[in-house]
Amino acid sequence: MTKPAVLLFALVMFFITNLVSANSQSKGEDKLSDLLRRATIGWNTDWSKHSIEYRELLSGGPPRDGIPPIDQPKFIDNQQAEQWLAPNDPVIALELNGDARAYPLQILTWHEIVNDTVGEIPITITFCPLCNSAIAFERHYQGTTYDFGTSGLLRHSDLVMYDRQTESLWQQFTGEAIVGAMTGEQLKMIPAGLIGFEQFQSAYPTGKVLSKETGYSRDYVRNPYPGYDDIHNNPFLFRDPVDKRLPAMARVVTISDGEYHNAYPVTLLEKFGVIHHQLGNQPMVVFSSSGSQQRFG
């Protein structure tokens, strides 16, 4: 019997798919730029270990944890969440060991990372507003539970996280450590979906929803990136050649098993509803479901 492929479903901008083909080998001598040095003063990162060129790391503006992760998340029930979430508001949804939780993008857009424990499993929920990628990871790795924060750096316009235990840098889109003591290590991805709040309610009537009581003063009903995902825009701080097969800001569903990587335009999924395809030699089906609007608008 063929072992099923491990699939990752993430709604992302098309340009970010170039990451999966990036050379992950050390580039040899590649000194930190003056800008990068200034952005990382006081860090205890082991800069002698890296699998990328340092010139690929760019400051997104805010300092480390200037976009604050949520470390002590509070949750409410579906009925309480109805007071401020519309039925089609997008949430990152997952279920582990019978524990179902939803993380509204209205909150994640402002924080990007939530360190949580779901079904007794330490996890981190991540969202990159620049590439619209929503990915969950198991954060207990080789006997250590890691806490993640925002580094303030970007690579290929994607969130670069750091762990507080070793201060290594991790690429959000792949879950791979790219700089520091953990370079080359890979976090385990956890199946999570980007769905509408009403869909979460229907599937998990007793599920929990991340509360707006985050400990930070943010206007969660306001989108801090209005118009960013206009199809005619260019990705922020993306300096590599853009794949011309689709507009750079086109939304796609990506599926990966670690070796093979497919991208499906959302417009195509909305048109056909179901697409039968293969990931490598593994047959697969991709479904489109209505009921969730896009966060940006």
Stretches found by the model and what they are:
Residues 1-8:
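Bacterial N-terminal signal peptides that target proteins for export
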